[in-house]
Amino acid sequence: HLLSRRQRQMCIRDSNYTVREMLMRVDRRISEKILTTIEEVNMDTLALAESDEEVKQSLEACDYTVIADEGILRAASADTLQRRHEIEDHDFFYEFFKRLERNDKKIFVIAESQKAVDEAEEFLLGLFDRARISGKGVLDDSPGCSENLVNEINIVSPDVIASFLPSPSQEKFLLHNREKLLMNLWYGIGNNKFMGKKHGFIGKIRKMLDVKRLTHLINTYEHR
């Protein structure tokens, strides 16, 4: 993939941060009660930003973009082994939600249908069983839905909005409602691929178990 100059500027500003550095920056902003917006960005989102002015504005206004597609790193010539592994395993997502769980932060989940929002909640609780899901809401095409969702969110007044909306709905909702939402942090996860495969962490655990099983089998065989 080749990135345009605008695409490079949009994603390269944060791609040099390690996950640890990003988390420290976000923690600092949260402790200072500064409204913070984070978006996971993949190649499709960047392509949309080229053709849709509102998506472009929304992404440019985000405080942090998290690269969700290692192809972006390669195209932006910012590819390092550490960053590639962090992106493959979605380390920021995992470490950030571990912090939310540990600190008992109120999380409001949004998606494009009741089925999608239920699946997103199940996905999060499957990984972070003590995560505090304080509310969930749907953004679809029905009249007044956007205003109703803003009201639902503000009644809960969550620490974090976790958005699983697809692009461009996610970026447009944030662009038009950022100033109205009572929240500390917006995390636009979108429909990035790790929703389907859970998280690299699970894969790591499985690999570790496989290695242990293999070691056990070898030891058993050797001691016969």
List PLM regions with ranges.
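Single conserved hydrophobic/aromatic residue that forms the stacking wall/gate
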Residues: 1-12
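A charged, well-structured terminal subsegment
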Residues: 215-224
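A short, gly/pro- and small-residue-rich
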Residues: 55-61, 171-193
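Conserved beta-alpha
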Residues: 73-145, 152, 156
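Short, flexible loop segments at boundaries between secondary-structure elements
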Residues: 139-143, 182-214
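Short glycine-rich anion-binding loops that position phosphate/pyrophosphate groups of nucleotides
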Residues: 43-44, 165-169, 192
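Proline-aspartate-enriched helix->loop->beta-strand connector
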Residues: 153-167, 183
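Metabolite-binding pocket within alpha/beta catalytic cores that recognizes anionic/polar moieties
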Residues: 13-99
